[in-house]
Design a protein with these regions (language model features):
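Solvent-exposed, charged interface segments at domain starts and junctions
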Residues: 4-7, 26, 37-46, 114-126, ...
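Bacterial Sec-dependent N-terminal signal peptides
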Residues: 1-28
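Alpha-helical interaction segments
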Residues: 4-7, 36-37, 43, 68, ...
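A generic structural signal for short, non-catalytic loop/turn and secondary-structure boundary residues
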Residues: 16-18, 62-63, 68, 187
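Alpha-helical cap/lid subdomain in secreted, periplasmic
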Residues: 83-86, 105-238
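Generic surface-pattern signal
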Residues: 6, 51, 55-59, 187, ...
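Serine-esterase "nucleophile elbow" of acetyl-processing enzymes
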Residues: 25-115
Length: 238
């Protein structure tokens, strides 16, 4: 019996000082409760921003029968858009430096679920900066337009023209061509409008008005957004 107890004691001692046991002793108990990483690597561009929109929506339900602003950073940075259109329920889903491909990719996340009464689109600026042609930008707009029509029916769709800016002045010929193609497409359709802010942002010499922009000469200041507010107001649904 004594021999059996001695053997058992040796086994216990060996286990106590084994690497596995030492590791368990040194590892905090909270390690097992560490949160699981839910964001997988290699997600498409702006995935985190879209996830943040969804998180906010889960906390506070967006207004029903709203006007949805969707597109790139010119909308994202329009943080006072609701104040600029009092009495109009606005959902602003501008994100990143998005292109038409990005908006198309996330349409199921940031357009369809809201069932808006009107969609206002600003996009194409970054597409041209990335080297896409005016015709390519036009085709991507048409794809997005057709997607919205198919899913949301005859709601009003408003396209805000691609804006000129000092930092992208060399792209102005492509901007004008893309704007013209989209304008002509919209002119042949009902429940669709083209808002020309492009020419409102040029000086008499045909250059972008410098004092409408912040230091990066790409994004707008309050003066720039005031022009947009005045141009857009007649096209918004009450």
């Amino acid at each position: 019996m004594k021999k059996t107890l001695t053997t058992f004691a040796l086994i216990v001692l060996c286990w106590a000082f084994s690497p596995t046991a030492l590791l368990r002793a040194q590892t905090p108990a909270t390690t097992a409760a560490a949160p699981v990483q839910t964001i997988a690597p290699n997600q498409p561009p702006f995935w985190n921003e879209i996830a943040e929109f969804k998180r906010r929506d889960s906390i506070q339900r967006p207004p029903a029968n709203a006007i949805l602003f969707v597109g790139s950073s010119s909308f994202r940075k329009w943080t006072g858009v609701q104040n600029d259109f009092p009495g109009y329920p606005i959902i602003n889903r501008g994100f990143g430096g998005s292109t038409f491909d990005d908006v198309i990719r996330y349409a199921g996340d940031i357009i369809y679920p809201y069932h808006p009464k009107e969609v206002v689109i600003y996009c194409g600026d970054n597409d041209l900066a990335a080297g896409r042609s005016a015709k390519k930008v036009y085709k991507r707009f048409v794809k997005l337009y057709d997607m919205i029509r198919k899913r949301l029916g005859n709601i009003d769709i408003v396209f805000v023209s691609i804006k000129p800016s000092p930092s992208r002045e060399k792209l102005m010929p492509e901007m004008e061509q893309a704007n013209d193609l989209i304008r002509n497409f919209i002119a042949e359709r009902s429940h669709a409008s083209f808002v020309d802010v492009y020419h409102l942002m040029l000086n008499p010499q045909g250059h972008p008005i410098d004092n409408l922009f912040v230091a990066d000469k790409l994004h707008m200041n309050e003066k720039g957004y005031k022009i947009w507010q005045q141009a857009l107001l007649p096209y918004l649904d009450k």
